[in-house]
Structures are given as C-alpha cells and as structure tokens.
C-alpha cells in the first residue's frame, strides 16, 4: 500500500552546537535533510512528502530541494511551537492517502524495508512504531542517587518513522489539542485515546543525530553502508 510522509525539520537542534540548523550539516557530502528525504524519494510506495520547516529557513530548504532534484516534496509547512504542533501542521497538508509516516529529519539511516513493514502493520493495527530493545541497565534516580533498578526486559527505545492510519492519527491529535495535552511522540497520543500501537523491531543504526558525537557515529554508519 502507498503512503504519504511527514518529515520534521523545523527544530533548532541546540544540542548539536553547530551554529545552524543541523539539517544543513553535511554527511558524506550531502546535507543531512537531503539524505533523509532521499529514503522516501526513492521508495516507490511513497507518493508525497510534506516537509515541516522553520519559516525563516523556507527559502534555503527550497534551494536544497531544487539543487538535489527532490521531486516528492509537495508542500513545505511551517513548524509550530512544539514538535506536536509541527506534526499537526503537517497533517493539514496531506493529500489523503490512507497511511501516513511521521519521521524525524535527523534520522537519515532508516531502511526502506522497515518503512514497508511499518505501513503493513499500520494497515492491520492502525498504528505502528519502530523500536529497539534497551541494552543498558536503567535506573530510576532521585537527584543523583539511585532509587530503583528498572526491569529492562519490557523496555523499548522508540524511533521514527511512526506509521498510522490517517483517520486515527488525526483523531488522536484533535483529542490532544482539545485537552491541551502534549505527548512525547505521536504514538503516545494514540495510546491516550485507548488504541493499540504495534511495535516493529527497528535497527540500532537508525539513530537521531542530536549531539556532535552523533556525527561521528553517523559517518561510521555511512561508511559501513557504502561498503555493503
């Protein structure tokens, strides 16, 4: 089944300390956002991309889309005050495919086969998210003193893209908007209205580039991909 994608690129990325939006940082000779968009650009099941940007950077994004010949970005939408508001703005710009994938622009390493697994699961269950099992020991703390060691056997680290039936994620966002609720991700809004969210086993290499150290990991992942 086909799908539309919302790609979020409006964040400030302060933790990267790059002096610019991290989406414009180069990774292997291409801007980060271009690498991310190309995953969807090259997937035949993706019919359309909505790119959510800071309005002050709109022209720069438009120049990148033209320079790198990215054809599937059909709309550039302004970001909101919070990530959730940015997603909501992106949802308003969709054309109406039954399934939508919502993705962080700073995750350039998602695999196409994972996109398809997520789409198939969203068709069946309504909502699906990629996640990886937590490897480290997790402790709950009060200040800098341990209160409890958490059983990690049921813990998952959640990634994007997150996939939804459009009608379901619209319902979830509208309910959150009316209640003034801010969730930590889009799936949490679906959970809030009592609907199931299916986990699809993700890939540890599908990292989100957040800090300068992540750029080093990203270069290593890119080198390994090029060697495949």
Swiss-Prot record:
Pathway connected to this protein: Isoprenoid biosynthesis; isopentenyl diphosphate biosynthesis via DXP pathway; isopentenyl diphosphate from 1-deoxy-D-xylulose 5-phosphate: step 2/6
Catalysed reaction, written as an equation: 2-C-methyl-D-erythritol 4-phosphate + CTP + H(+) = 4-CDP-2-C-methyl-D-erythritol + diphosphate
Gene3D superfamilies for this protein: Spore Coat Polysaccharide Biosynthesis Protein SpsA, Chain A
EC main group: transferase
Domain of life: Bacteria
Annotated positions for site Transition state stabilizer: 15, 22
GO biological process: isopentenyl diphosphate biosynthetic process, methylerythritol 4-phosphate pathway
InterPro entries for the chain: IspD, IspD/TarI, IspD/TarI_cytidylyltransf_bact, ISPD_synthase_CS, Nucleotide-diphossugar_trans
Molecular functions (GO terms): 2-C-methyl-D-erythritol 4-phosphate cytidylyltransferase activity
Keywords recorded for this protein, A-Z: Isoprene biosynthesis, Nucleotidyltransferase, Transferase
Site feature Positions MEP for the nucleophilic attack, where: 152, 208
Chain's role: Catalyzes the formation of 4-diphosphocytidyl-2-C-methyl-D-erythritol from CTP and 2-C-methyl-D-erythritol 4-phosphate (MEP).
Family in the record: Belongs to the IspD/TarI cytidylyltransferase family. IspD subfamily.
Protein's name in the database: 2-C-methyl-D-erythritol 4-phosphate cytidylyltransferase
Species the sequence originates in: Geobacillus kaustophilus (strain HTA426)
């Amino acid at each position: 089944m086909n799908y539309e994608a919302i790609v979020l690129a409006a964040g400030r990325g302060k933790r990267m300390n790059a002096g610019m939006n991290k989406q414009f940082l180069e990774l292997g000779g291409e801007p980060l956002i271009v690498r991310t968009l190309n995953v969807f650009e090259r997937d035949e099941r993706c019919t359309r991309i909505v790119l959510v940007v800071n309005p002050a950077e709109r022209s720069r994004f438009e120049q990148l889309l033209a320079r790198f010949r990215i054809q599937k970005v059909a709309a550039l939408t302004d970001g909101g005050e919070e990530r959730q508001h940015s997603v909501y703005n992106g949802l308003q710009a969709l054309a109406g495919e039954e399934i939508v994938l919502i993705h962080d622009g700073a995750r350039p390493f998602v695999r196409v086969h994972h996109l398809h697994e997520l789409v198939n699961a969203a068709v069946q269950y309504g909502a699906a998210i990629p996640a990886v099992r937590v490897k480290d020991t997790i402790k709950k703390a009060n200040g800098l003193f341990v209160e409890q060691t958490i059983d990690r056997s049921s813990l998952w680290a959640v990634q994007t893209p997150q996939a939804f039936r459009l009608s379901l994620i619209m319902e979830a966002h509208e309910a959150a908007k009316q209640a003034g609720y801010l969730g930590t991700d889009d799936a949490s809004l679906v959970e809030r209205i009592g609907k199931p969210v299916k986990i699809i086993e993700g890939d540890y290499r599908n990292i989100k580039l957040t800090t300068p150290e992540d750029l080093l990991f990203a270069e290593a992942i890119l080198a390994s991909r090029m060697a495949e």
